[in-house]
Amino acid sequence: MCGIAGFFSTQKDYCKEFPRYDHILNQMKVRLYSRGPDENGTFLAKECGLAHTRLSIRDLKAGSQPMIRQRNGYRYVIIYNGELYNTKELRNELIQRGEQFETTSDTEVVLLSFLYYGTDFVKKLDGIFAFAIFDEFHEKLLLYRD
């Protein structure tokens, strides 16, 4: 099981105090280590900080998180824990609609589903999950769980 943590505020610029907030994110990772000892990562932007520890199950090499994709100059970032039972179907549906994948991970399927379908994409997910998506364009942090 992976671990996810973070913080968000549109009233604060976390990058102005990068060392402080980077340290906080790293402390979060340390606390989550037992939930995902295989890999870990952080993401820090003006409005948002995310931390992730990973227990590698699928796409062991390319499923690193936080996973970042760019659209029209804006970043979309996901930290994810879970298992989708309909990964293959969603992936094929997105490929047919022109989406391109860099990995075979559930994480990327979830993020690209969000980018393609918008916030209602979660209704398409069949599985067990908890995740956060940072939407830089709309300056939002979206939290989801099954």
Whereabouts are the PLM-identified features?
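N-terminus-centric sequence/structural signature that marks the extreme N-terminus
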Residues: M1-D146
